[in-house]
């Protein structure tokens, strides 16, 4: 299990010898044994059914009213003492709530499960029922959908139907899509249904992934920063479908580029998907270079070519051979004296030096240094004219170029420049 919180509960809750089949099964055990005090009710002289009703009341009232906690007076004193003693709720200034968000999520899952079973396939009745709680139900519904992808029966009878049934309200269809793409288990869904998903549905899932398949984490070191991290397995599956041209690469160009860029930022990547992602981006790079040659000018496209190059550079493990050949060609073009109008070489070399991604520097350190040397050294073919002005800093005397003289390294020095940092950190010199 990847969640340390679960591991702690397995040990502290006495689940070490339990036959836990999957996360859903374990969450059911958490609900019965920990949250509802199944084995400890007798100790406090309370009924488990009363504990369950109390927990549900605390959770639903707090969520529907969007408050930090609910009044402790609404809870029976014996049940309140039991829940506090077992670490299920916390109290502050006579306000109580469940101690962990995950406890509340499990409570909502149980509620949604019951409403779903009671609807007997009338999904709009199901949605009307759970919507009575208020807007707070949307996020919990997404979590419920994410976990339902475990169960094959649920995928066949429910999730696929929600995506294709036109009688389902648009807002619930959207919430279903969000739940799918945020799930780490949605690969099971794509594997079974990708042949049945038409281009429109795939495009919708692509856009939803780009908008919602992230989680925010607060980082307190060295300053307070919120990091937004891509999550879920949707990108991996969608990239495979894009690579097979299940949707138009031209029509969905912006969305596909973002999809691949976000995948490049994922902590866990597979070699196969990474290779597909960078090859998709290379196709766009080649198209822009050809377009620039036809227009006889790179000015209109150089910024976009550089951005696409940096996406590929983030996936340097898979794209190493292409990056080496591409940057070497840029170095040759730059040294040949080709003007900036006729080549994007200078912009690519500047990107390597000023925005060098970690993996590029780690996989191709010599090429990174060679790019800097080429950019900062004088070109043999470069002629100096009177209007170039006096060489105040003697850069030309030292064999350096204007790029070296005007290189913006601001007040933070090596700590604000990735290339310098990697050179210093990794002993490239």
Task: Name each model-derived stretch.
Residues 13-77, 92-97, 101, 114:
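Winged-helix-like regulatory helical subdomains adjacent to P-loop NTPase cores
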Residues 100, 105, 109:
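Basic, glycine-/proline-tolerant helical and adjacent loop/strand elements
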Residues 3-5, 19-25, 118, 182, ...:
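Intrinsic-disorder/low-complexity, polar/charged segments
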Residues 80-81:
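Type-3 copper protein
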Residues 84-94:
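A short, conserved structural fragment
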Residues 67, 92, 113-429:
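Extended amphipathic alpha-helical scaffold segments
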């Amino acid at each position: 299990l990847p969640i340390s919180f679960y591991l702690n509960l397995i040990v502290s809750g006495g689940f070490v010898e339990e036959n836990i089949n999957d996360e859903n099964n374990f969450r059911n055990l958490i609900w019965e044994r920990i949250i509802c005090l199944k084995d400890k009710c007798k100790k406090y002289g309370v009924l488990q059914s009363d504990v369950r009703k109390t927990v549900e009341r605390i959770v639903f009232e707090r969520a529907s009213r969007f408050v930090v906690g609910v009044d402790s007076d609404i809870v029976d004193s014996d049940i309140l003492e039991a829940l506090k003693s077992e670490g299920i709720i916390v109290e502050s200034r006579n306000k109580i709530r469940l101690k962990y968000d995950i406890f509340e999520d499990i409570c909502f899952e149980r509620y949604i499960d019951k409403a779903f079973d009671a609807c007997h396939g009338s999904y709009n009745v199901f949605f009307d029922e759970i919507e009575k709680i208020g807007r707070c139900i949307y996020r919990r519904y997404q979590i419920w959908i994410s976990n339902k992808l475990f169960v094959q029966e649920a995928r066949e009878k429910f999730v696929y139907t929600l995506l294709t049934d036109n009688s389902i309200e648009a807002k619930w269809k959207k919430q279903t899509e969000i739940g799918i793409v945020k799930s780490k288990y949605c690969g099971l869904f794509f594997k079974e249904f990708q042949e049945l998903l038409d281009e429109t549905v795939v495009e919708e899932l692509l856009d939803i992934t780009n908008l919602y398949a992230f989680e925010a984490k607060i980082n307190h070191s060295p300053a307070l920063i919120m990091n937004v991290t891509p999550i879920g397995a949707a990108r991996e599956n969608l990239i495979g479908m894009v690579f097979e041209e299940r949707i138009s690469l031209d029509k969905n160009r912006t969305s596909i580029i973002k999809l691949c860029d976000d995948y490049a930022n994922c902590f866990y990547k597979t070699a196969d998907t990474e290779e597909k992602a960078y090859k998709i981006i290379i196709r766009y790079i080649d198209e822009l270079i050809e377009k620039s040659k036809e227009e006889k000018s790179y000015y209109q496209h150089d910024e976009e070519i550089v951005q696409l190059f940096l996406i590929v550079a983030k996936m340097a493990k898979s794209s190493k051979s292409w990056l080496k050949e591409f940057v070497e060609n840029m170095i040759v073009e730059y040294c040949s004296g080709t003007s900036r109008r006729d080549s994007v070489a200078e912009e690519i070399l500047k990107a390597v030096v000023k925005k060098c991604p970690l993996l590029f520097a780690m996989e191709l350190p010599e090429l990174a240094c060679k790019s800097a040397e080429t950019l900062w050294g004088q070109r043999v073919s470069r002629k100096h004219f009177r209007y170039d002005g006096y060489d105040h800093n003697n850069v030309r005397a030292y064999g350096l170029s204007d790029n070296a003289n005007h290189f913006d390294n601001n007040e933070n020095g090596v700590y604000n420049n990735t290339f310098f940092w990697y050179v210093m950190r990794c002993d490239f010199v």
